Amino acid sequence: MARRLLTLLGLLAAAVASPVLWQKDCAKGPEVWCQSLRTASQCGAVKHCQQNVWSKPAVNSIPCDLCKELVTVVGKVLKDNGTEDEIRSYLEKRCEFLPDQGLASECKEIVDSYLPVIMDMIKEEFDKPEVVCSALSLCQSLQKHLAAMKLQKQLQSNKIPELDFSELTSPFMANVPLLLYPQDKPKQKSKATEDVCQDCIRLVTDVQEAVRTNATFVKSLVAHAKEECDRLGPGMSDMCKSYISEYSDLAIQMMMHMKDQQPKDICAMVGFCPSVKSVPLQTLVPAQVVHEVKMETVEKATVQEKTFSVCEICETMVKEVTGLLESNKTEEEIVHEMEVVCYLLPASVKDQCKDFIEVYGQALIDMLLEATNPEAVCVMLKCCAANKPPQQPVVVKPAGGFCDICKMIVAYADKELEKNATTTEIEALLEKVCHFLPESVSDQCVQFVEQYEPVVVQLLAEMMDPTFVCTKLGVCGAAKKPLLGEDACVWGPGYWCKNMETAAQCNAVDHCRRHVWN
């Protein structure tokens, strides 16, 4: 169902894994250098591509957005003084999620070979993750995308568009005289009586003749135009060649349309000769055009964005997790897949979806693992209203109903607190955590904190794993007794507040004074 993030690094592997370039290939310029990070590295042009090609605006797409999220995470790790080994471990771990072993191996090879280059780019372009993703071929150039769409639109219709010749002829038409009349050959000067119109007609006539008789004329014209780009200097030269590479096909199409038309009519269209009458470039036939009404309907439909409630997000996650459990996925893989689902939802609910996973994710997985009816999970989590009784009996969880709320609190603590948090920080979080959970479970949260606060503080200082902490407390699991091992302090307030000695033993004197002895 949702496998796009798992294929992200696979796309990266396929995009960067290009054949080794020979020196003659590198001599072809930026068009070859900037195809991928591998080609740029082989041609020693990483900095050039980073500054002049990959920094251009990119098209929004799912692979591009996911890549930018991944690069942002790595950037934050670098900002927090994360080591290269930590980042390598993180990326290689993501490579292991790829379903295809070949792509997984290729992904790891790319990480091993180009990680220093990628890290340097992330440090330099921390606020522009799209630059790194363009280098990895996961973000597409907006300029190329628009040019391709424009060309594709023309190819899908045989309608002759109204072309702006003043825009399309430069710089190709500007180089036609140089190609037809080389400067090293002396030419007779035009007579003073010859006007611009006659010059245009002669030029168009020569171009038409060259197109008809010389099969290589068009290609040589494009090559000559690229050579002329070198006259513009280092900064503009590459941009000029890039422009020619993108728009040369369109210019060639224009020339092919010109070859069967009257030169005077063409010169009249571009304003060099007086217009006698309106003459089309060629005989028009019915065009394959989509009706405007139909196009408006489609555009309006795509703008509308579905809104999602917490209940709908929960039901979506239950359906996803149920399918993953049937596929024997590990809990780590399931959580990863749940995060992928958030990226496939509208942007307006992406953060809400992530918060849902942080608070309810582990509890949802545990309930489904314990054979809870999927239709009842969201109702039991108080995310959906109980409109109708479940069709199948629900397996009621033991331990007084504190298991789910315990896991929510521990998951929240794990998210908000740093590693090695002090007991003071943990106590401060427990005092306010109930205000951040859904109102439907706030009373149960307060009861839980009042009863288990001291031992929860001790366990969270040891480990912030929801399953470990809540099982250790005895509120989760199938144990008949809430006691695990011989530690009497996990028995709860009934033991802590028995007397001052037991309260001191379990570090619960303040708790007993506030809630029991007063």
UniProtKB/Swiss-Prot annotation:
<comment type="function">
    <text>The lysosomal degradation of sphingolipids takes place by the sequential action of specific hydrolases. Some of these enzymes require specific low-molecular mass, non-enzymatic proteins: the sphingolipids activator proteins (coproteins).</text>
</comment>
<feature type="domain" description="Saposin B-type 1">
    <location>
        <begin position="60"/>
        <end position="143"/>
    </location>
</feature>
<feature type="glycosylation site" description="N-linked (GlcNAc...) asparagine">
    <location>
        <position position="420"/>
    </location>
</feature>
<feature type="domain" description="Saposin A-type 2">
    <location>
        <begin position="482"/>
        <end position="518"/>
    </location>
</feature>
<feature type="signal peptide">
    <location>
        <begin position="1"/>
        <end position="17"/>
    </location>
</feature>
<dbReference type="InterPro" id="IPR021165">
    <property type="entry name" value="Saposin_chordata"/>
</dbReference>
<keyword id="KW-0331">Gangliosidosis</keyword>
<dbReference type="InterPro" id="IPR008139">
    <property type="entry name" value="SaposinB_dom"/>
</dbReference>
<feature type="propeptide">
    <location>
        <begin position="480"/>
        <end position="518"/>
    </location>
</feature>
<keyword id="KW-0746">Sphingolipid metabolism</keyword>
<feature type="disulfide bond">
    <location>
        <begin position="64"/>
        <end position="139"/>
    </location>
</feature>
<feature type="disulfide bond">
    <location>
        <begin position="311"/>
        <end position="384"/>
    </location>
</feature>
<keyword id="KW-0443">Lipid metabolism</keyword>
<feature type="disulfide bond">
    <location>
        <begin position="200"/>
        <end position="267"/>
    </location>
</feature>
<keyword id="KW-0165">Cleavage on pair of basic residues</keyword>
<feature type="glycosylation site" description="N-linked (GlcNAc...) asparagine">
    <location>
        <position position="214"/>
    </location>
</feature>
<dbReference type="GO" id="GO:0019216">
    <property type="term" value="P:regulation of lipid metabolic process"/>
</dbReference>
<dbReference type="InterPro" id="IPR008138">
    <property type="entry name" value="SapB_2"/>
</dbReference>
<keyword id="KW-0325">Glycoprotein</keyword>
<dbReference type="GO" id="GO:0006665">
    <property type="term" value="P:sphingolipid metabolic process"/>
</dbReference>
<dbReference type="GO" id="GO:0007193">
    <property type="term" value="P:adenylate cyclase-inhibiting G protein-coupled receptor signaling pathway"/>
</dbReference>
<feature type="domain" description="Saposin B-type 4">
    <location>
        <begin position="399"/>
        <end position="480"/>
    </location>
</feature>
<feature type="disulfide bond">
    <location>
        <begin position="434"/>
        <end position="445"/>
    </location>
</feature>
<keyword id="KW-0732">Signal</keyword>
<feature type="disulfide bond">
    <location>
        <begin position="406"/>
        <end position="470"/>
    </location>
</feature>
<dbReference type="Pfam" id="PF05184">
    <property type="entry name" value="SapB_1"/>
</dbReference>
<feature type="disulfide bond">
    <location>
        <begin position="342"/>
        <end position="353"/>
    </location>
</feature>
<dbReference type="GO" id="GO:0016020">
    <property type="term" value="C:membrane"/>
</dbReference>
<dbReference type="InterPro" id="IPR007856">
    <property type="entry name" value="SapB_1"/>
</dbReference>
<comment type="function">
    <text>Saposin-A and saposin-C stimulate the hydrolysis of glucosylceramide by beta-glucosylceramidase (EC 3.2.1.45) and galactosylceramide by beta-galactosylceramidase (EC 3.2.1.46). Saposin-C apparently acts by combining with the enzyme and acidic lipid to form an activated complex, rather than by solubilizing the substrate.</text>
</comment>
<dbReference type="GO" id="GO:0005764">
    <property type="term" value="C:lysosome"/>
</dbReference>
<feature type="propeptide">
    <location>
        <begin position="18"/>
        <end position="60"/>
    </location>
</feature>
<feature type="disulfide bond">
    <location>
        <begin position="314"/>
        <end position="378"/>
    </location>
</feature>
<dbReference type="InterPro" id="IPR003119">
    <property type="entry name" value="SAP_A"/>
</dbReference>
<feature type="disulfide bond">
    <location>
        <begin position="67"/>
        <end position="133"/>
    </location>
</feature>
<dbReference type="Pfam" id="PF02199">
    <property type="entry name" value="SapA"/>
</dbReference>
<protein>
    <recommendedName>
        <fullName>Prosaposin</fullName>
    </recommendedName>
</protein>
<feature type="domain" description="Saposin B-type 3">
    <location>
        <begin position="307"/>
        <end position="388"/>
    </location>
</feature>
<keyword id="KW-0677">Repeat</keyword>
<feature type="disulfide bond">
    <location>
        <begin position="95"/>
        <end position="107"/>
    </location>
</feature>
<dbReference type="GO" id="GO:0005615">
    <property type="term" value="C:extracellular space"/>
</dbReference>
<feature type="glycosylation site" description="N-linked (GlcNAc...) asparagine">
    <location>
        <position position="328"/>
    </location>
</feature>
